[in-house]
Amino acid sequence: MVIEPLEGARKIITNVEAKEEMLSILDTIRNSSDIKGILMLYTEKYHGNIEYKQYLLESLESNIHSDKGRYTTTFRSAVNQFLKIIRNLSIPIAAGINGDLGPNDFGLILAYDLRIATEKAYFYNPNLELGYPPSALLSFYLSRSLGPAKATEILMTKSKISSREAFDLGLITEIVSEQELEERCLEKLRELSTIPSHALIETRRILQPSLDEISKHLDTSLEGFLRCLYKRQN
């Protein structure tokens, strides 16, 4: 099944309706015996640092003018719900990227089984340029994937990464043409669908971090993020 998440993780994590809609779709897929794999197809363009900064500031406003820590709680809850479903899927899940991914989506796809991109794909990490710490999801999964030293180097020196650079780092499984992308992703999903479901689930549990570990990182990261936002407001 192909899903094209408009506005990606950012909307799913911060918008309750969008989150519930995505969780409902994934729940339906999970309960279907006819669907053999999930392709999350990313085709949107990055709208620039000004638009992204506005999103960060709106996040701060929602935290200030609502119950204390609401944004932090909402973010952590949405991430945990989404990752829990991914971990327990009995079918493979892959990302097909033919556009731009912001920091949260970049981090999130590292939890998928496969990531296939085109030469047009770019991954953005503008937080430090804007005066904020890295995305909680991106900093966590990048560190897990590459180790703390390499992750630190990338987060501090790279605000934009090409698909070729991501492939060389081992973050992308394969690079294909735009015309080949969807079919290649579906082909790889069909290959992985031959793995018994219980073995697939247990493999993820062995290789993926625990949700408690992720939650602790999210709390620490978001506290630092909010401190920076408050300081820039004052």
Question: Model-derived features: where do they sit?
Answer:
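Hydrophobic, secondary-structure "cap" segments at the distal end of domains
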Residues: 139-149
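Intrinsically disordered, low-complexity segments enriched in small/flexible residues
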Residues: 4, 8, 39, 215, ...
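Glycine-rich beta-to-alpha active-site loop
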Residues: 78-130
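Amphipathic alpha-helical segments at domain termini/boundaries
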Residues: 1-2, 157-193, 199-213, 222, ...
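Conserved CoA-thioester-binding segment of acyl-CoA-metabolizing enzymes
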Residues: 1-43
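Glycine- (often His-adjacent) and acidic-residue-rich active-site loop
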Residues: 34, 42-78
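Hydrophobic/aromatic residues within transmembrane alpha-helices
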Residues: 40, 108-110, 166, 185
